[in-house]
Amino acid sequence: MIIVISPAKSQNFETATAKYQFTQPIFKDQITKLINTLKHYEVDEIEKLMKISPKLAEEVFTKHNNFDPKSYSELNSKAAIFTFSGDVYKGLEADTLDKKTIEYAQNHLLMLSGLYGLIRPLDLMQAYRLEMGTKIKIDGEILYKYWQDKITAQLNEYFNQQQNKILINLASNEYSQAIDKKSLDAKWLDIDFKENKNGTYKTIGIHAKKARGLMTRYILENRIENISDIKKFNVADYKFNLELSNENLMCFTR
């Protein structure tokens, strides 16, 4: 079983992490090509490309020009699972997971990324900003097309080493589209979280994101290897909702 989640725009490179056997990014050549392309963008071009403020564009410009694709070390990088700090990662709270769970996550959790493609928890990563939906072309292809075959092939390689070939999709639509479902050698299971608002169940972005992190933590801590055990999730008042679920979707409501 493999879980996929989205990355986060917010990243924390300040806090030190415990010592682990850190790993190198999976797609170094592809990352190098992408970052070298991004280095050609001036501040005003970044602002237009990413639809961000001038101040943020300057920060992104600095990040990308400081990026060294030839060297990933603890001097310029940090393990991905401890670096991302958005809503999903607030739910995951990786800093409070024990060492054995982090090591288990290394083989069962992957983060999708516009720059890195796929990131394992202990992969060293440098600061960047590149969403999968950014309208930049590499070799004449948009990011989805650039990454889709590479990401899917790598996932299939991982599934060849897994006993239970199930992909638990806890990523957003923006990122999960970078995987070719039809070519995936595994069952695909979506998980959704909804809130009861005046008798109607609705997906509320900020709550759903944190819940994805909570679910990721639950699966990792409990070493869950089959779908039926996921239904037992009852964190933060969420409960499995049979009526809103089907063979390919598990919905949890509160």
From Swiss-Prot:
One of its GO terms (cellular component) is cytosol. It holds the Pfam family H2O2_YaaD. InterPro entries: YaaA. One of its GO terms (biological process) is response to hydroperoxide. Belongs to the UPF0246 family. This is UPF0246 protein Fphi_1075. PANTHER family: PEROXIDE STRESS RESISTANCE PROTEIN YAAA, PEROXIDE STRESS RESPONSE PROTEIN YAAA.
